Amino acid sequence: MSLHDIFSQELGISKDEAFIMHWTMLAWFWLHWGQYASTVTKKDIGELTGVVQLFYNNPGVQLVWNNSPFAKPALEDDFVNFVEEIITPQNTSN
């Protein structure tokens, strides 16, 4: 079973929708990584922390975050650790 088949089945969406969702989530992850990498002030970190709390706790986002070989494995460890420390433990077991 392909990754997009898994996403499709888990989320109740078509395989085409799963493909689009997967790559859209990756674009957001990379955007957030860029924001993290360019943080300068505590306000920057606070803003990004709020985004991560809301965005990464969505079940579809969690599914991609935890299963895509282009998400956590492709991002810098500092950013992955930053996200992992923020998201709620009950959602990290996907």
Feature-to-residue mapping (PLM):
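Amphipathic alpha-helical "stem/stalk" segments
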Residues: 1-94
